[in-house]
């Protein structure tokens, strides 16, 4: 993957090299083709008359005690990851985000919220409930262990055998019988639905979709970088595609749409942290 280089007329602003932009756009484009337009019956279309509507990032709630949090709640950046456990692009981005977050210590935290795409992955909602049962039986550490293991073993695209769910529970050290009882109860269906409805209200139409909650307003340089990079990527995407990167009006929320590559995600974080 190519690294960043400065534009000659504006030496303090960094932009992606064309090859890197093309790779980013290709990944994003595949994710959009895969997901967008599959949830029309559950909310407004994200594309209308060839013009994408702006995300309503203010609809993404602040982190609370019920969230699945990896890191510190008051971190300068909290990544809210809306994800489908059978989505192949979610599997890619989950690994990418984990790698990026690990390099920032207490500056970046991660929150996971469910967004199963039933029309594409009929198993994803049940798997989301399984992850919630892991949380009930073992707390936050077991939730993340279960989630990480599920992403590691699933072939994606509805390919995971449901018989693997209790095996994953056993693998991460959960009591198999209690897990099976929890999962069969369906007690977490409402929790999954609430995450999904929040995502829809914020403009999520496909997965993966991440919203960065910032403790402080993004700097002018960071906003310029995000806006310019989005414009470059947009040139490689079909007209009317939702924005790949977007900064909310208050400058304290940023969305990332699609399975963006490690280099681009890290550059966004570096800009937001003034590194």
Give the role of each language-model region.
Residues 60-77, 102:
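A short beta-strand-turn-helix
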Residues 61, 67-68, 115, 149, ...:
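Flexible, active-site-adjacent loop/turn segments at secondary-structure boundaries
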Residues 18, 31, 39-44, 59, ...:
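Short leucine-rich amphipathic alpha-helices used at interfaces
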Residues 75, 80-85, 91-170, 200-205, ...:
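Structural alpha/beta surface segment adjacent to cysteine/selenocysteine redox centers
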Residues 2-36, 166-275:
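C-terminal cap of thioredoxin/glutaredoxin-like
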Residues 57-58, 88, 187-188:
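Short, flexible loop segments at the rims of nucleotide/cofactor-binding pockets, characterized by
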Residues 37-55:
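Ser/Thr/Pro/Gly-rich low-complexity linker/stalk segments immediately outside membranes or between
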Residues 64-67, 96-97, 196-197:
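A generic local structural motif
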